[in-house]
């Protein structure tokens, strides 16, 4: 599919569906765009969860009941320590030259950052080169703003059929584009010592019917990679 066809035909159709379909997440409630969740315990890890898509918490009124809360509890279970997760649902791949101030402020004391892909219409219509450039820009700024030992985790763009009930006509190109974006993200992670790619292929009910019942399962797919890296940082200086 050419970029011209993608932007001239497919993108408007997909945006119309996302705005009007009863299967879309858009009409669901969601928490405030930023918030904090915590699990008490010794020597707590401080984590920034940032991005659109699954971080937003569609279907929930509180981040404690959405991905942020479940991720904090899963990581604490694995590490035996406390966990504090600051959730910022700004789409850092939107093309803005600079990260929002609230993101850079949190980064100053973060042990780890978990980046989730943005909304389907913001991500899957990006040419691969632009996606890589925007992601690289965000990673450069995060690395500069955070402590030297901070780890950054890029959660894969999932097969969209597993998180949203896409119309059949969109599924083939969505699968191809998602795979291409993940290839770009993996390449960036290989080039950076502090950046880890986290595979993410959930199962279960997609779309509105699954939202709110799947955050626990999604967190279980992400938490092990984060917990292992946090446990491996024996020289953490920001505790």
Language-model features: locations:
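Conserved SGNH/GDSL esterase-like catalytic core that processes O-acyl groups on lipids
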Residues: 46-48, 54-133
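N-terminal secretory targeting modules
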Residues: 1-48, 226-239
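Short acidic/His/Gly/Ser-rich catalytic and metal-binding motifs that mark active-site loops
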Residues: 122-124, 160-165, 206
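Substrate-gating cap/lid alpha-helix
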Residues: 163-198
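Alpha/beta-hydrolase-fold catalytic nucleophile elbow
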Residues: 116, 155-156
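A short helix->loop->beta-strand "cap" motif at the edges of active sites that frequently abuts
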Residues: 146-151
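Alpha-helix N-cap and loop-to-helix initiation/capping positions
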Residues: 63, 126-134, 169-180, 210-217
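Histidine-centered active-site loop/cap adjacent to the catalytic His
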Residues: 181, 206-239
